[in-house]
Amino acid sequence: AAPAARAALREEANLALAAMIQEKASDTLDKVLFELSDGNRVETVGLFYKEGWNSFCISSQSGCGFGCKFCATGTLGLRRNLTVDEITDQILYFMQQGCSINSISFMGMGEPFANPQVFEALHDLTAPELFGLSQRRITISTIGIVPGIQKLTREYPQVNLAYSLHAPTDRLRETLMPITKTYPLGQVLDTLDQHIRQTNRKVFLAYIMLKDVNDSDRHAEQLTKLLFKHKKYLPLYHLDLIPYNQTTVTETMVPSSHTRIKAFCRIIHNAGISVNIRTQFGSDINAACGQLAGAYRDDQKQGERTMSAIQEQSFEWLLCPVCKSKTRLKIRKDTILDNFPLFCPKCKSEMLICVKQFHISIIKEPDAQTQSR
């Protein structure tokens, strides 16, 4: 029954994705640009290995509002969350092309745990009567949204979890990834320890290698010290060192040399930590880590379009109703959000917000239990 249901999905599904407007291919992968029914765009990458294994990197948001300094997607700002259909339709598209689906990673555009629809998508992707994927064939990569990690542990404990680490100290990571002010390294790693304890599953740590930023011997020693604070669960942590993929909108960031990456890796390995240097695919078509930016024009016009997108952004302030502190949000003028979860960086209170035309309003204030925390 399940194969028949999946065949019906493949043949008869009315995709929420309005159109495939661009496809680029290299030796081992395809990058597809989709335009949604409202004109927003997302990118999806399919990796096709010689052994016959097909893996797909899908997006959970159009754009991203977290502003990581090395990421092309972050320069666009958050446009909106994808619906559950828009998430799963990225997979249906490849199914309609006759591709088998062996594994899926939420490593495309956006932060998965900032979109509640991701958990609905996990339900559909793992439901036997729908896509029928094993939880272990799915990976979610996060910048460290603690409530999302905790929910994944409870509801989908066998889904693979990857944490975008990228720096050995809070001070450095805050300059690269502002989310660190809300969820510092110690809090996230404590939460990952709990995940390992409850699931007995390996956690992957991603570390992008940036020349003269986070790649020195001292940084490697700091990283070793950080991870040994979690020595009890260290055997189930695995560190991936990722050669940085430079883009036209992140030109201030430069990749570390291969020699430097190998030296960094040697220090980590000699400390007894599981580590490897990740092989990268797709940098020639801007489909590798950190390169997805929803571009759709010729390469000559890509920089012009990205600058236009940046000019359509605004930084707006949200006042926490509990502690009265202000949080700065980067949004686009066409951003529309309903019931978007947000945590106050200072008091950790959770609220739901609505965003429309640069106007932010709180539609659900923290309850008494949340405030007491």
Predicted segments, located by residue:
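Radical SAM enzyme core and accessory elements
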Residues: 1-13, 270, 280-307
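Flexible, acidic/Gly-rich N-terminal and inter-domain linker regions that tether
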Residues: 1-54, 306
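Canonical Radical SAM [4Fe-4S] cluster-binding loop centered on the CxxxCxxC motif
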Residues: 48-86
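Residues immediately within or flanking Cys/His clusters that coordinate Zn2+
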Residues: 61, 65, 286, 315-317, ...
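Short cysteine-rich clusters marking metal-coordination/redox-active sites
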Residues: 68, 320-323, 344-347
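Cys/His-rich microdomains that often coordinate metals
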Residues: 68, 75, 327-329, 351-353
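Conserved AdoMet/S-adenosylmethionine-binding subsite of the radical SAM
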Residues: 94-103, 108-271
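Short, intrinsically disordered terminal segments enriched in charged and Pro/Gly residues
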Residues: 307-317, 331-335, 354-373
